[in-house]
Amino acid sequence: MHTQRKRNIALILLAAALLFTGPAYGSKEIRFASVSWTGVTVKTELAKNILNSIGYEADNKVLSVPIVYKALDMGDVDVFLGNWMPTMATIANKFLDKGTIVQYVANMTGAKYTLAVPTFVYEAGLKDFSDIAEYADKLDYKIYGLEPGNDGNLVIRSMIEQNMFGLGDFEIVTTSEPIMLSEVKAKSKEGEWVVFLGWSPHYMNQIIDMKYLTGSTAETFGENDGTATIYTNIRQGFDKEQPNVAHFLKNLIFPISMINEISLMLQTNKDLKHGEAGMAYLKENPEVYRGWLEGVTTADGEPALPVFEDYLKSY
């Protein structure tokens, strides 16, 4: 009887192990998550392509910000390259504090994420968060944000709900990156007033004559007028399971000028995919990928740099 019971317990434990869907220790599978923003997509597609070229099996799941963090927390994805701080703190910090997600390395510094307006609106007097309510009628009591659940949207919603800067009567217009930019461009062309979520690096800074507002606070977009640092997040334990990929991620630092240039390439050539634009940039700027691949091997343990350079010749 006891022997049979032990066998049953062993079978249950074996079944539970077989149901686990995560990659095995030392697996070649690398699971990225991203959101549908130009810069994060470029970074993720580049990292995915490089890892695939050196023998890994990397993929990229496009999700919303809250779902990215839930997936990392549950161990369903491994890496996220788009942790914009401080604005994502409201979503990310509970997982970072819990320890299921690790803020692994800053992959970009000196970025910006805050409210912006067309330059003609700025020059007419709307220069600071404290000025927005004064021009409520011209703005139709609206602030344009991004997709549902976006961290910037949460900040705007909090500003409205708490009547910060006198914005209690405003509403947030939920859109997406391309829809928001299309609306801003159209309104700017017609001389209509609009306040919207802006960020850098991004091609919007080249195609829209725009200014960023001053006056954000620690409770909104940060005390330094929206200055942001973007971090690479990994699920707990990933760096121990995949030390070579973790080393690559430590090296994976993105200059702002690089993302601006690639973003502009995508804007001027609508047929170009994010990964293709990124590879074209690397082909012209080999010092970037050489730094990324320093000390990195292929999945089979060979030096990664010559393998990737052979792959890059196909672009």
Predicted regions and their residues:
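A conserved helix-loop-strand patch within extracytoplasmic ligand-binding domains
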Residues: 99-149
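Ligand-binding pocket segment of bilobal, Venus flytrap-like solute-binding proteins
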Residues: 77-81, 151-218
